[in-house]
Amino acid sequence: IPFIKAARHYCPDLKLWASPWSPPSWMKTNGHYAAASAGEDHDEKYRNGLPKEKEGHEGTDMMIQEPRYLKAYALYFQKFIRSYADEGIPIFAVMPQNEFNSAQIFPSCCWTARSLATFIGQYLGPAMMQEGVSVMMGTMERANTALVDTVLSGSQSAPYITGVGFQ
């Protein structure tokens, strides 16, 4: 927060967006911050303690897809937005998940495009609309237009998406 405030001192019109690397572990199917294991085959500093059998994989959902979890996660976003606003830092947009199609050894969470569309359309989109915050889809690190098309063509999710980000 101090660095953001310092940057805004020099650029008062600075626009900030936010994107989580992972939902809280208790909201994930594997109960771990990471989606891929980093065991004995990795340098000790990268080992994360995730057993191989609890790894996630691209094209699967690691976020628990129950309404109570999805509603709670949207509330996390709202509380984040409000907390930063209380510090004088407006957030103009959020992305529901950074690299949602990648299982990583660091904080990460795979989502299917269909589940992401449901989360945006029924939970995150309405919550962010209440806060006056846009929803962007991203970040996509591989050009898989089918994933984007699924979310952008969803009758519930599409109205909330204001942009798509690729890297």
Model-predicted segments: where are they?
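N-terminal catalytic cores of secreted or lumenal carbohydrate-active enzymes
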Residues: 1-91, 122
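Active-site neighborhood of glycoside hydrolase catalytic domains
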Residues: 69-167
